């Protein structure tokens, strides 16, 4: 009996504790969803509801240290919304309408009553519960901001059926992909290195696999992606074009869950769940198996040829995250990401050079990757302020090894061996310490501020060479240029709802970059304003400045391990940009349709590029002697029409854009179009939910061709030939277009994904290469063959089908 009484007492104590949880809230005419954020921070509870029931619901409440149950009752009084607190969840629903009942019989009867049902009964429509993670564009002051869920990423058909974050963003207006099939991204006339990629707020320098065919983000464990391209939050700086923060899932307390995905080119596994009552975990692993698939193919090729081909490649992504809840006010987290690429290529030839059994073995080994680790604490200081403190480490490394071995035997049988070896590596190591605060000083105002310190360590290039013969051994090392830099950033911004119609976001970001005993600084003001004359329409304007201290040196537009990240040193100045944007936004009354038009103009200064004839510089010349700084502009208009809800969703967008560059040491100092000066870009994305089991997806993209420099003349010397100077980016490729399709079929345990890349097999031209054609000409001595230079179009990817299966458990 005592045990029963004790259990009852414990139960009543728990119920009393939950119902008596105290909160402090002050809001006047604010949207209910906004007030929920305050309640979540103070109680840690989850609010479960359909977003439809809160449309247009504004609440006024001002309480101090009152039970949550009483606060909710006061908030929803007279709104027709009911709530129920169950465990850690607060569930909301509409109150049922009162109904009038009429007795079937006038008095108690002991008789059998027979009813006939109408066969033409009215069937109720299915109840669809929808949730929208991001606020509609008309409700915010931001321009060019987008929040994308993992489901939206998976609904974008891509190459090899690999759901890809960056390729999903390529479907947004103002964003172009660069080279076909690659995960590069060029935003509003910017370069590929002007985008800041972050994983849970930690920067990453290399976000691609296999020259950019795949990005480094495993969609299976992603929660959502924040993307900014016009009005930049003051929190972010360091890049000129865009900011992308990929947020990972947290583990769940409601049991262990996971999935296993098997595809033609890769597989992935993820698992999550609780560890005790206060800790959760999530683990994700993705690996390609090109190294396995190429084994039988190479075995067949090498069995028939004297030349033996060597090719082996794989990539891997590993994510792990642990979250621990100390109390409703404090939560700690730790996470790690490791991305790894390995490429081995080369050949072994039998030579016929007069020596017995002579062979040449030529090998290249590439190894590159990322490591990101962080630990942090979220802490609610008081009902109006919360903070996050983080320590992080991010590293990019790249290593290339080349070995060329020649073996033979002399006439007297003595072995003859020569070997040439070369090793080149570059890396970046950053230690990051940051503190971010979120403060709500009064109704309608949300202030964010913080600071961070970064210790950079750059090793742009380190090369060693070894030459070995039977009688000598010569080893050389190129000069190593290593840099250490200290970076300090601070920011503050206020997201202010001035009135029901006016809102604004004003902030400033200050930065200091110290290297080689010199300090460089940047002040980046940010301002965006919105006027909303009615519930369905808004007009916005924004200005932002950005400063960039690190840059990527690349001689191609592919994501290669030989690309180098270097800091601003010596005479070079940090890149800066100033951007203005205006836009109009509309949303239908039923929240199903949305449309927007945005215009922008961007000025860029101190851009870095290789100067003309940089290849004539001595090989060991300092890298900065080959560079020059200049300026650029970008302008354009982005239009978008979007259907948000329903069985058929998607969007159509069109961009009209111009982008140019001007360098004193390029193109004779005259302006020239940027490589990705794509005048017209059209994107169409459609998602059709055919039934509960089947979904069809289609993505069509088309844009004006990329530009590049076509050299029409060559200077031939006695020992070499070199191109004569031509106008930079003087040729434009043909119009690019492609259709991708996918179909998702669900079953009880998981789902199949069938995809078709380049469905109508249009071979797009991605480059022009110089070749030589043999031409026979009649002379006085008869026909004579000569080589004539010609230009050939390079076309890459035809129609490519793929299939994968995901098992969920």
Report residues per predicted region.
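Flexible loop and strand-edge segments within Gram-negative outer membrane beta-barrel domains
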Residues: 329-380, 395-427
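Outer membrane beta-barrel strand-and-loop segments of large Gram-negative receptors
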Residues: 430-434, 478-484, 489, 573, ...
């Amino acid at each position: 009996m005592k045990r029963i009484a004790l259990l009852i007492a414990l139960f009543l104590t728990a119920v009393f504790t939950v119902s008596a949880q105290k909160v402090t809230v002050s809001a006047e005419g604010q949207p209910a969803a906004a007030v929920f954020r305050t309640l979540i921070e103070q109680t840690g509870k989850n609010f479960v509801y359909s977003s439809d029931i809160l449309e247009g619901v504004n609440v006024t409440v001002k309480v101090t240290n009152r039970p949550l149950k009483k606060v909710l009752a006061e908030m929803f009084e007279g709104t027709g919304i009911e709530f129920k607190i169950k465990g850690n969840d607060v569930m909301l629903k509409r109150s049922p309408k009162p109904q009038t009942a009429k007795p079937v019989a006038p008095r108690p009867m002991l008789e059998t009553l027979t009813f006939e049902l109408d066969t033409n009964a009215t069937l109720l429509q299915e109840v669809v519960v929808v949730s929208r993670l991001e606020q509609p564009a008309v409700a915010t002051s931001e321009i060019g901001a987008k929040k994308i869920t993992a489901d939206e990423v998976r609904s974008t058909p891509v190459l090899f059926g690999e759901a890809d974050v960056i390729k999903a963003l390529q479907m947004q207006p103002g964003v172009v992909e660069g080279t076909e099939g690659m995960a590069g991204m060029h935003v509003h006339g910017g370069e590929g290195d002007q985008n800041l990629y972050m994983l849970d707020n930690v920067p990453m320098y290399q976000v691609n696999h296999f020259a950019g065919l795949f990005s480094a983000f495993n969609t299976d464990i992603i929660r959502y992606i924040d993307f900014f391209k016009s009005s930049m939050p003051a929190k972010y700086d360091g890049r000129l074009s865009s900011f992308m923060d990929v947020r990972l899932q947290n583990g769940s307390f409601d049991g262990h869950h996971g999935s296993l995905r098997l595809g033609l080119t890769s597989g992935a596994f993820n698992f999550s769940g609780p560890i005790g009552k206060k800790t959760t975990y999530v683990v994700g692993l993705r690996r390609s198996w090109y190294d396995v698939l190429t084994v039988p193919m190479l075995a067949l090729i090498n069995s028939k040829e004297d030349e033996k081909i060597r090719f082996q490649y794989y990539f891997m992504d590993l994510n792990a995250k642990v979250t621990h809840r100390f109390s409703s006010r404090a939560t700690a987290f730790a996470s790690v990401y490791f991305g790894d690429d390995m490429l081995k290529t080369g050949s072994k030839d039998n030579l016929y050079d007069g020596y017995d059994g002579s062979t040449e073995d030529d090998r290249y080994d590439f190894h590159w990757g990322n490591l990101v680790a962080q630990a942090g604490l979220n802490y609610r200081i008081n009902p109006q302020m919360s903070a996050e403190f983080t320590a992080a480490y991010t590293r990019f490394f790249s290593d290339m090894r080349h070995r060329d071995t020649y073996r033979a035997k002399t006439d007297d049988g003595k072995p003859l061996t020569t070997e040439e070896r070369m090793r080149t590596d570059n890396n970046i190591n950053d230690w990051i310490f940051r503190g971010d605060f979120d403060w709500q000083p009064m109704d309608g105002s949300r202030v964010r501020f913080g600071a961070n310190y970064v210790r950079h360590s750059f090793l742009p290039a380190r090369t060693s060479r070894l030459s070995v013969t039977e009688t000598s051994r010569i080893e050389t090392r190129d000069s190593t240029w290593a840099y250490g830099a200290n970076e300090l950033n601070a920011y503050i911004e206020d997201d202010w709802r001035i009135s029901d119609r006016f809102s604004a976001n004003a902030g400033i970001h200050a930065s200091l970059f110290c290297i080689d005993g010199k300090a460089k600084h940047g002040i980046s003001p940010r301002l965006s304003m919105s006027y909303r004359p009615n519930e369905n329409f808004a007009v916005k304007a924004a200005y932002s400045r950005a400063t960039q201290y690190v840059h990527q040196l690349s001689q191609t537009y592919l994501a290669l391990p030989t690309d180098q990240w270097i800091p601003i040193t010596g005479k070079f100045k940090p890149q800066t940009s100033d951007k203005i944007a205006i836009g109009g936004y509309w949303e239908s009354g039923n929240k199903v349709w949305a449309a927007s038009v945005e215009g922008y103009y961007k000025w860029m200064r101190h851009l870095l590029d290789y100067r003309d004839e940089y290849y004539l510089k001595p090989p060991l010349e300092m890298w900065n002697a080959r560079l020059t700084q200049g300026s650029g502009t970008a302008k354009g208009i982005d239009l978008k029409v979007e259907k948000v809800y329903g069985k058929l969703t998607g969007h159509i967008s069109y961009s009209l854009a111009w982008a140019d560059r001007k360098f004193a040491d390029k193109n004779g100092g005259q302006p020239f179009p940027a490589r990705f000066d794509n005048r017209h870009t059209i994107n169409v994305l459609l998602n059709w939910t055919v039934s509960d089991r089947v979904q069809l997806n289609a993505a069509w993209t088309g844009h004006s061709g990329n530009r590049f420099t076509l050299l029409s003349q060559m200077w031939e010397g006695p020992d070499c030939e070199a191109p004569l100077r031509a106008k930079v980016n003087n040729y434009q490729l043909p119009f690019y277009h492609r259709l991708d399709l996918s179909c998702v079929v669900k079953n009880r345990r998981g789902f199949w994904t069938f995809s078709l890349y380049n469905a109508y097999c249009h071979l797009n031209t991605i480059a022009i290469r110089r070749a030589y054609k043999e031409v026979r000409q009649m002379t006085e001595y008869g026909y004579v063959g000569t080589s004539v230079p010609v230009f050939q179009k390079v076309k890459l990817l035809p129609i490519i089908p793929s299939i994968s299966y995901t098992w969920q458990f």
